[in-house]
Amino acid sequence: MSRFVTSVSALAMLALAPAALSSVAYANDKLVELSKSDDNWVMPGKNYDSNNYSELKQVNKSNVKQLRPAWTFSTGLLNGHEGAPLVVDGKMYVHTSFPNNTFALDLDDPGHILWQDKPKQNPAARAVACCDLVNRGLAYWPGDGKTPALILKTQLDRHVVALNAETGETVWKVENSDIKVGSTLTIAPYVVKDKVIIGSSGAELGVRGYLTAYDVKTGGQVWRAYATGPDKDLLLADDFNVKNAHYGQKGLGTATWEGDAWKIGGGTNWGWYAYDPGTNLIYFGTGNPAPWNETMRPGDNKWTMTIFGRDADTGEAKFGYQKTPHDEWDYAGVNVMMPSEQKDKDGKTRKLLTHPDRNGIVYTLDRTDGALVSANKLDDTVNVFKTVDLKTGQPVRDPEYGTRMDHLAKDVCPSAMGYHNQGHDSYDPKRELFFMGINHICMDWEPFMLPYRAGQFFVGATLNMYPGPKGDRQNYEGLGQIKAYNAITGSYKWEKMERFAVWGGTLATAGDLVFYGTLDGYLKARDSDTGDLLWKFKIPSGAIGYPMTYTHKGTQYVAIYYGVGGWPGVGLVFDLADPTAGLGAVGAFKKLANYTQQGGGVIVFSLDGKGPYDDPNVGEWKSASK
């Protein structure tokens, strides 16, 4: 009898399979369609190209000086606000730092909160969070007729949550990590097909990194791939790196570590993703090895510091390119991944992937197989590497700036913050330019030995940070840059200095504009071609998120979170004075509090401040008796 039932069930599943696949295809096609509409901003980076580029040009370089605030919304929280809100079909979805509240706003009357989710979390998560209590955003899934449209979020205390996009009710909730060992969640979820992709945080506490795919409809785990360890844990495809065997193939997830050090070896991924439907690969980077003290973990420490291309359906890695073997500086390689299609120097159209890394190098790979196309310095002041050998993919180190125990490294450029960090940059496909926010910060590094204790910081270095050579080291200003980069020529069309690091990222538009926020609390617009500053506005607090844009009822809006914090703001947020505190950030940003203070919210601009409240009746109370 049981055999009969099993057979019938199997036949039923086969019969349902086409319908299930059809619903998946429908939902994915709808998400792609929504991402192409400039009314919406449905995922981090706007679309699967992850390019933060909009075709909108109602706001352009001839009229940008007319931008005025249209409306604002306070989240009620004061820690750093990273990422950007989502806009879908006339609603804005706003997220916050811990405790990771979520708000749905009606764009016809944004003062009206449609629903709000305020989770109760384990407060112990705060103690194991590195570098403020930030969160990088939300994801949207459009539903399939049976499952409602969802807003997906991560919580610092390890949970992944799916909320009904219309009501805010919890549809499912799963545990992704374990705060007892220091594993938290700060990453924005990423929806691909019928899966939501989730990374991990906690390398500073010796957390072993992994990437997980969950069924977006149920929260069931589909696959999990680790950054270190045996091949079966890494999910390496049979043809892994087959076209670039010199990058390394099987067995290296353990062989490049001493003993079982890979079990506490880091490699978490808390940054940004991209996806190519043509290759069906998800692109992302793994972070720094643990501990920071390189003496304690001999070897290349694969596959930390790696750009992976993983199959979205199986999780199998088709390629992996390790940018910084045996990282000595905490150059966690999780930064933004931006696909493009461009002609190379030989005139051949290539499917490319560009990634500005913490280590001071901006990489461009062939995204079909991971082959390295170019590797150029983010700034000519990078000194840890002399160059990158394009044949081997290996960086050529300058030993003077290494961090070994018998050598006190001074004036190391970039600092552990990198010349680029979590900011989400933009790519203008018409100009073939990447607009990148830069941290112009260097450091002194003093390593020390320490034991591993689960749930405690596992770093092993004291850092002192200060402005890079182009900044003002006496006054601790000039810690940032904004640059326009061509990946094919390896040249910079323009670059401009900023008082502080450009931490949040950029937005490029067809209006010939580049927008970005600054730590000292400005939203700025520059000319895409020249870098000339065309407009700026002082916002209530420093910005560590990136701007986004959308249209509603024919009006273009530009929005950005305000709320200083994150790694550069830890001194201000937690009132720290020791320059080596905050893993060295407090000293570098000692002047930040002179220019901004804490806040938390979103501010939305339009030409002449046009918006829903031009009608004075919008938002007004109406008596039921009238």
Swiss-Prot record:
Membrane topology value: Peripheral membrane protein
Intrachain S-S bonds: 130-131, 413-442
EC class: oxidoreductase
Known cofactor(s): pyrroloquinoline quinone; Ca(2+)
Positions annotated as active site in the UniProt record: 330 (proton acceptor)
Signal sequence extent: 1-27
GO process annotations (BP): methanol metabolic process
Catalysis performed (reactions): 2 Fe(III)-[cytochrome cL] + a primary alcohol = 2 Fe(II)-[cytochrome cL] + an aldehyde + 2 H(+)
GO cellular component: outer membrane-bounded periplasmic space; plasma membrane
Entry's EC annotation: 1.1.2.7
Cofactor binding remark: Binds 1 PQQ group per subunit. PQQ is inserted between disulfide Cys-130-Cys-131 and the indole ring of Trp-270. Binds 1 Ca(2+) ion per subunit.
SMART domains reported in the protein's UniProt record: PQQ
Entry keyword annotation includes Cell inner membrane: yes
UniProt-annotated location(s): Cell inner membrane
Chief place where the protein resides: membrane
GO molecular function, one term: calcium ion binding
Keyword annotations from UniProtKB, A to Z: Calcium, Cell inner membrane, Cell membrane, Disulfide bond, Membrane, Metal-binding, Methanol utilization, Oxidoreductase, PQQ, Signal
Residue numbers binding Ca(2+): 204, 288
Family affiliation: Belongs to the bacterial PQQ dehydrogenase family.
Subunit structure, as described in the record: Heterotetramer composed of 2 alpha and 2 beta subunits.
NCBIfam families to which the protein is assigned, alphabetical: PQQ_enz_alc_DH
UniProt function note: Catalyzes the oxidation of primary alcohols including methanol.
Protein name, entry field: Methanol dehydrogenase [cytochrome c] subunit 1
Gene that specifies this protein: moxF
